[in-house]
Structures are given as structure tokens and as C-alpha cells.
Amino acid sequence: MEKVINNTYEDILIEEKIGSITLDLKKFNLLEYVIKTRLILYITKKIFGTANGIEKKHVEDIIILCGNNIGNKFLTPNKNLKITVRNKKIYFEKQN
């Protein structure tokens, strides 16, 4: 499963910087629900080194936000992470 998630991540990745990851919204929305949830946790681990603080409800809210495809909306599942949907992209950003 980890290999599938890693390959999917590489496929939909637009840009990766320290503390920030940008994904293609259209490709993300085409994924299966299980892959989306694992991918969100994978990205959180990639940014912070752990997925602690991200609960099932947060992951569901992120998937709903992306599925609604409404621009300029964001979520802050915890005080350190901000997820924004803008310009057909998903931005995962570490907050300082």
C-alpha cells in the first residue's frame, strides 16, 4: 500500500518545498476515497514527520473541501497545518 501511495503522490505532485506541498486538484478528486485518506496522512507525515493531531474527521473535511471544488477556501485542522484549495490546486502549508 505504501508503494501505491508513493506512486500516486509522485503522479499528482505539482510542487514540493520545505513546509509546503502543492497537488493537482483534478487528479486528486479522481482518486479512490481510501487512497485520498492515506495520501493526506502521507503528506502530513512528509511535512511534520508525524500524522499526530490529524484525526479522521479532519481528513474527511479535507476530502469534502477538495470535492466541492470551491476556490479560495481553506481548513486548519490543527494550528500548524493549513490546507487551501485555490486555482485548481491543493496547498498543504506548514504554519509557523
Predicted regions and their residues:
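AMP-forming adenylation/ATP pyrophosphatase catalytic core
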Residues: M1-N96
